Curated annotation (Swiss-Prot):
The active site is at 144 (nucleophile). GO terms for molecular function: metal ion binding; pseudouridine synthase activity; RNA binding; snRNA pseudouridine synthase activity; tRNA pseudouridine synthase activity. Its main location: nucleus. It is found in: Nucleus. PANTHER family: PSEUDOURIDYLATE SYNTHASE, PSEUDOURIDYLATE SYNTHASE 1 HOMOLOG. This is tRNA pseudouridine synthase 1. Formation of pseudouridine at positions 27 and 28 in the anticodon stem and loop of transfer RNAs; at positions 34 and 36 of intron-containing precursor tRNA(Ile) and at position 35 in the intron-containing tRNA(Tyr). Catalyzes pseudouridylation at position 44 in U2 snRNA. Also catalyzes pseudouridylation of mRNAs.
């Protein structure tokens, strides 16, 4: 693009004006401005005359026409204007069936449904119904496709004269999307910018922390590296082998066919079926028997106190301010925005849901980048499964070397709530208002979480075995040295992305991508 001209313009920029100014003998004064003799109003008068002529011509041409400013939606001339107040709107939702939080026509999104409900309930006037920006519409945290939120916040200017406005809004929403309440704020409130921190929850079955299955690529690498399964993992896999043998499936047959189902699965597209040696006449009945036995043992697994303590130990290493460039996409080590502060990370005691044991991990941080939470969870689980040294490995991920950390399934992730500690102190102190929080609706939120979020997560895992497919993919991956950082030496040059990409290029091989940023879109907050 060429540079714009720097010639100053006074009045109309037509060439006639320039010639007239030249005739008047105007010259540039200090600062490059044009000097016009005081008292000479001829140029100004001509300019005003021309402006009047244009205005009269436009009025003449516009007779009988609606000359109001055009918008995407109709202007409602007879709509009674009602006062709008700046508010924080507390919401919760199950993200199943939605293409994320953020408005993204023509896709079905949380914001799209909520905004339409606001309009139908009269919380937003018809004249402002065509564009959320007219109401200063903003979200505290954007969640991606399929991700849930027990609590999220929207700030906007809204009509709240009706004391039943929340009930009216909810009457226009599906059951999986709720408005908990509305709180008055000051005019300058912006829910994203004034959010002090955010709390996320990640649910996962405890069998996710088991050692890799014997005979898999990862298991063989660990054995060669001198890392044996822990006692709990050893006993678990021995019991699976004994159960299979009692049903006529030998250990060798199990090893031969163990990876076939995962290789065919959608979660493991990176591994070609030809990479596993198996007979062309694979016994489908035997495969089904193996899957059924493994599934039953996963459901019956109960995590030990020792393994649970290790999970909690690793989570604590994340606390504080660190460079999380390895836990997102496309973020350079030197990028200041890669520095993030984690306030606390905790793991619940295990609990049973429909016979399967689960744990809940809570992550409280100031802000998060794209995929960050899912990659953090993945690193915790992989470290436990492979008996890695977390005190060595996790700090290495905060350093310059770039590695591929696979992201754990989106299934278990939900936004619990944004936190407004600093803003609430100011709001209560200066304005005497209650503040922005979810305390008034705790019972409703808990009931909603169990019915519309937790139960859907549990049911999807039981039916589709999402976590099993993810960790099986890691166990059978043969593409390159991507996961060799889980061995005793930790992160070495050979398992960095720069080294592997350079080597693949030199050998004329296709560079394998472990993940694509296909279902999530980078955004202004980069949440989750």
């Amino acid at each position: 693009m060429s540079e714009p001209t720097t010639t100053p313009v006074v009045g109309n920029s037509a060439s006639g004006d320039s010639a007239e100014q030249h005739d008047l003998g105007q010259k540039r004064g200090k600062g490059g401005n044009w000097n016009r003799p005081r008292g000479d109003h001829q140029a100004k008068k001509q300019k005003m005359d021309r402006r009047g002529d244009r205005q009269r011509e436009q009025e003449k041409q516009g007779e009988g026409r609606d000359t109001r400013r055009k918008t995407d939606g109709p202007l409602v001339a007879d709509e009674v204007r009602q006062p709008k107040r700046k508010v924080a709107c507390m919401i919760g939702y199950c993200g199943t069936g939605y293409h994320g939080m953020q408005l993204n026509p023509p896709q079905k999104t949380i914001e799209g449904d909520i905004f339409q409900a606001f309009v139908k309930a009269g919380a937003i006037s018809q004249n402002n119904a065509d564009d959320p920006k007219k109401s200063a519409f903003m979200r505290a945290a954007r969640t991606d496709k399929g991700v849930h939120a027990a609590g999220n916040v929207i700030s906007l200017k809204m009509i709240i004269e009706d004391e039943n406005i929340v009930e009216k809004i909810n009457s226009h929403l599906p059951e999986q999307l709720r408005v908990w309440g509305v709180s008055r704020t000051n005019k300058a409130f912006e829910c994203r910018k004034l959010c002090s921190s955010r709390v996320y929850e990640y649910l996962m079955p405890t069998y996710s922390f088991l050692n890799p299955r014997p005979g898999t690529v990862m298991s063989e690498k660990l054995l060669k590296d001198g890392t044996s399964p822990d006692e709990e993992g050893k006993k678990y896999w021995e019991s699976v082998a004994a159960d299979l043998e009692s049903q006529g499936v030998s250990y060798d047959e199990w090893m031969k066919r163990a990876c076939i189902d995962e290789i065919k699965g959608e979660e493991t597209k990176e591994v070609a079926e030809s990479e596993v040696k198996t007979d062309s006449k694979t016994d489908a009945a035997t495969l089904e028997k193996i899957k059924a036995v493994e599934r039953r043992h996963r459901e019956e697994f109960r995590i030990s106190g020792e393994r649970l303590a290790k999970i909690r130990e690793i989570l604590k290493i994340y606390e504080g301010t660190h460079n999380f460039h390895n836990f997102t996409l496309g973020k350079a080590f030197k990028d200041p925005s890669a520095m993030r502060t984690m306030k606390s990370l905790t793991c619940s005691d295990p609990f049973l849901i429909d016979g399967t044991e689960w744990v809940s991990i809570k992550i409280h941080g100031q802000s998060f980048m794209l995929h960050q939470i899912r990659k953090m969870i993945s690193m915790v689980a992989l470290s436990v499964r492979c008996n890695a040294d977390p005190q060595k490995l996790i700090p290495q991920t905060f350093e310059k070397a770039r590695i591929n950390i696979p992201k754990a399934p989106a299934l278990g992730l939900l936004l619990e709530r944004p936190v407004y500690d600093s803003y609430n102190k100011k709001l209560q102190g200066e304005f005497g208002r209650e503040g922005v929080h979810f305390d008034n609706w705790n019972d409703q939120i808990e009931a909603f979480k169990h019915k519309f979020i937790y139960d859907k997560i549990y049911a999807e895992e039981k039916g589709q075995h999402v976590f099993h497919a993810f960790f099986s993919f890691v166990d059978v991956f043969t593409g390159d040295a991507s996961f060799d950082f889980l061995l005793k030496q930790g992160i070495t040059k050979e398992c960095t992305t720069d080294y592997m990409n350079k080597k693949a290029k030199e050998e004329g091989k296709e560079i394998k991508k472990l993940e694509e940023d296909d279902d999530e879109v980078a955004n202004e907050q980069n949440e989750g």
